[in-house]
Amino acid sequence: MTLTPFIVLAHGPSRQKVVEEIEVNAAPDKVWAVIADYCSIKDWNPLITACESDNGSQPESIRIITLENGEQIKEKLIKYDPESYNIQYMMVEPNPNAMPVNTHGATISVKSNDNGGSIVTWKGAFYRSFPGPNPPPDQTDEAGKEIISNLYKSGLETIKSQAEQ
């Protein structure tokens, strides 16, 4: 009997990253005033229709956001730093009907620019929710990136318009 060795390769989701930023013609403190409340996301992101938080903007606070399609996502506040204008959070209960991603974590930060204004950066990383090598078209890495990117861009555009008023 002859045994022939062979290699089995498995390929699942890989970590994806999305970074979006926007320049705002307003000082960082004015921009921060728009986003400072952890649940104010419903006021500056048109893709989010509601937000409920169990403990405001305190670290470990849990918020449940409702998207336009009625689906909800549960997120935990990891870091809240008003002095450096930084909010970090992560998804704690993925909902593939809301977004085809798992383990989404993100940071929103505000920095001053050279013109007296601000740069707002929203960056995140995630794994797609479909675990296997051949995801359906609406659950690919690219689909996840597109949804996250659209979420970030719509929020950043509204932050800009509100802070510049």
Segments the model singles out, each with a brief description of its role:
Residues 30-34, 41, 63, 77, ...:
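Hydrophobic pocket/interface hotspot
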